Amino acid sequence: MPRKGPAPKRPLVKHPVYGSQLVTQLVNKILLKGKKSLAERIVYGALEHARDKTGTDPVITLKRALDNVKPALEVRSRRVGGATYQVPVEVRPDRSTTLALRWLVGFSRQRREKTMIERLANEILDASNGLGASVKRREDTHKMAEANRAFAHYRW
């Protein structure tokens, strides 16, 4: 444990093109091997693709998708007297956004479309409609928390 306390959170700048912190976070999640311009190109292309399909503001579509993917509960392992229990805990808002973006990007990488732009755009569109693998992941997480509700009194 550090003696000075937790490190302060660095403020995220709003994205210069879309004016949203969520787009900045999405670009940083897509980023591989320091190629930020490539990550930005992928995100811009995916958001334009989403705009063409829906005809609405892509940032609103992204927010709706994230709201459908953000988990409210998760399970954490807690060791009590030689047994390990999966204890359901509430997820902090910043962690739920991070998890949602991680799942969105991770499952878009596993999709079958040809380019990453198409994969990301279609995963965002599916998630905004309540479909897709990332929404299923959230449902599975909630089911796991519900199944282990008996251990909720072990929360810390």
UniProtKB/Swiss-Prot annotation:
Entry keyword Acetylation: no
Listed GO biological process terms: translation
A Pfam family hit: Ribosomal_S7
InterPro entries cross-referenced by the UniProt entry: Ribosomal_uS7, Ribosomal_uS7_bac/org-type, Ribosomal_uS7_CS, Ribosomal_uS7_dom, Ribosomal_uS7_dom_sf
Keywords of this entry: Ribonucleoprotein, Ribosomal protein, RNA-binding, rRNA-binding, tRNA-binding
UniProt KW RNA-binding keyword: yes
GO MF annotation: an example: rRNA binding
PROSITE patterns noted in UniProt: RIBOSOMAL_S7
GO cellular component: small ribosomal subunit
HAMAP family registered for this protein in UniProt: Ribosomal_uS7_B (MF_00480_B)
Family membership: Belongs to the universal ribosomal protein uS7 family.
Function: One of the primary rRNA binding proteins, it binds directly to 16S rRNA where it nucleates assembly of the head domain of the 30S subunit. Is located at the subunit interface close to the decoding center, probably blocks exit of the E-site tRNA.
Subunit-level organization: Part of the 30S ribosomal subunit. Contacts proteins S9 and S11.
Protein name: Small ribosomal subunit protein uS7
Organism of this sequence: Mycobacterium leprae (strain TN)
